[in-house]
A protein has these predicted regions:
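Short beta-strand/loop motif that positions the catalytic acidic residue
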Residues: 345-347
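Primarily recognizes the serine-hydrolase "nucleophile elbow" in alpha/beta-hydrolase
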Residues: 295-338
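Gly/Ser-rich "nucleophile elbow"/oxyanion-hole loop immediately N-terminal to the catalytic nucleophile
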Residues: 267-302
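C-terminal catalytic histidine-bearing segment of alpha/beta-hydrolase fold enzymes
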Residues: 352-355, 372-445
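Short beta-strand element of the alpha/beta-hydrolase
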Residues: 213-222
């Protein structure tokens, strides 16, 4: 079994050397090298493209999916780019992007390794819970190297009109571009007060200006992503990277903080590890180092990370301007302080813990005088349908909003409903709903 320190070593290797004279390379379609391109989806990181670099600009007009092949994958599009990033698409560029079907069987890079006798939600021990707060889990999520072999099978043309014939050779990727993930810094925080070491990922807004003030989003992962490899929380799903995407940053520039916990941070007995205090201390340290708006601190988390978010809202009721709580629960007897906070809660009716758990929590909040807005949504909706439903829902203007995905809608077609499928698939969808993210950013302390 790979150790946590061994996996997530992506794209290692030296550039492939082409030992042909320049004239031969121009007459045949030999690339200088190939880069594997990954993208994070709601269910994790996938290999979604291969970028092939050429000596000179390639004309996009003559490119087609039939001109390239990638072993074991489906080619869906081929276009020119100025870099290995598909976002840099142009009419002519030295890079050719070979886009791959993200639903291909070999696209998903995550592989779960479970110790014998394990079970429960997202890889925890037998018994259905994540383990006790502070425990080091026995399971891992192992990520395969992002690698592929690409071949040019048809003739393409340079910007100058020269034809590059099929090379007849397969080119192995020798580098990796992880979209959005690579924009995060991997750091560690030594909490002298507690004595903890906390690894974390930090996204700093592009063109950061210390004379401005920026919101900060804290995302905390589920127990299944517990690891001592710092990037794991970025690869597991959209909870962190969605806020740092170019689209979100263009509309809502912010810092994104994604701690990587190496231990269980919250358990089913409504207890947290010392990482709760350490995470708060980290936020305080970052707020002193950067121009962070303390009136616009936001917290979100899935499963165990949601539970930690609730615990923070109870222990530090004036800290966060709003909380996005996804697929988690807590002891209803402890949640009264949440009645005076701004919450957006999302669960699935197929979740045997979070659904009844949040029903109990919101009932307590109403008893405390809070106004709770409720709705049932279809997790299969497209972006336009989610926005229409949100606009109708948000018209109530409630500070506490509770959405449940309808029974059976959160589980992808063909996927088993057994185990924690209804639980895990909640965050596969929840973080994709842009109007919810917009709502979070409208809130201020």
């Amino acid at each position: 079994m790979h150790s946590r320190r061994e996996f997530l070593i992506v794209g290692a290797g030296a550039l492939l050397s082409i030992n042909l004279p320049a004239s031969a390379q121009e007459r045949t379609g030999h690339g200088l090298g190939a880069t594997a391109v990954t993208q994070v989806f709601g269910d994790g990181v996938r290999l979604t493209a291969v970028a092939v670099e050429y000596h000179e600009p390639i004309a996009a007009g003559g490119l087609s999916p039939s001109a390239f092949t990638v072993e074991g994958r489906t080619v869906t599009d081929v276009f020119a780019s100025t870099s290995a990033d598909p976002a840099d698409r142009v009419d002519a560029g030295r890079f050719v992007i070979v886009a791959l079907a993200p639903e291909d069987e070999g696209a998903l890079l995550a592989e779960r390794v479970q110790a014998q006798g394990g079970g429960g939600e997202g890889g925890p021990p037998a018994g259905g819970g994540p383990g006790q707060a502070g425990d080091i889990p026995t399971y891992d999520t192992v990520y395969r190297d992002a690698e592929a072999r690409v071949g040019q099978t048809g003739t393409i043309a340079t910007l100058d009109g020269d034809a590059l014939a099929a090379s007849g050779e397969m080119l192995a990727t020798s580098d990796t571009l992880n979209l959005v993930v690579d924009d995060f810094r991997q750091l560690q925080f030594n909490d002298r007060e507690i004595g903890d070491l906390l690894r974390y990922n930090l996204f700093v807004p592009k063109d950061y200006d210390a004379s401005r003030s920026y919101p900060l989003v804290l995302f905390m992962h589920d127990a299944g992503a517990t690891s001592d490899v710092t990037r794991t929380t970025l690869y597991q799903g959209l909870g962190a990277v969605i806020w740092a995407s170019p689209q979100d940053q263009a509309e809502r520039p912010c810092f994104v903080l994604a701690p990587q916990y190496a231990e269980i941070i919250a358990d089913d007995d409504s207890r947290t590890s010392s990482m709760m205090e350490t995470t708060i201390h980290l936020i305080e340290a970052l707020a002193q180092e950067y121009a962070i708006d303390r009136d616009r601190l936001y917290v979100t988390g899935q499963s165990g990370g949601c539970m930690m978010s609730i615990a923070m809202d109870i222990a530090y009721p004036g800290l966060f301007a709003a909380s996005f709580l996804v697929a988690g629960q807590w002891n209803p007897a402890l949640v009264a302080p949440l009645a005076r906070q701004k919450l957006f809660i999302v669960v699935s009716q197929d979740d045997s813990k979070a659904w009844p758990g949040q029903n109990s929590i919101t009932a307590v909040l109403e008893q405390e005088g809070a106004r709770v807005n409720r709705a049932v949504w279809d997790a299969r909706w497209n972006a336009e349908e989610f926005r229409t439903a949100f606009d109708e829902f948000n018209a109530e203007g409630s500070p506490i909003n509770y959405v449940a995905f309808g029974e059976g809608t959160v589980i992808p077609e063909g996927e088993s409903t057994a185990g924690a499928s209804g639980h895990r698939n909640t965050w596969r969808v929840a973080y994709t709903i842009e109007p919810v993210r917009e709502w979070i950013f409208r809130q201020q302390r």
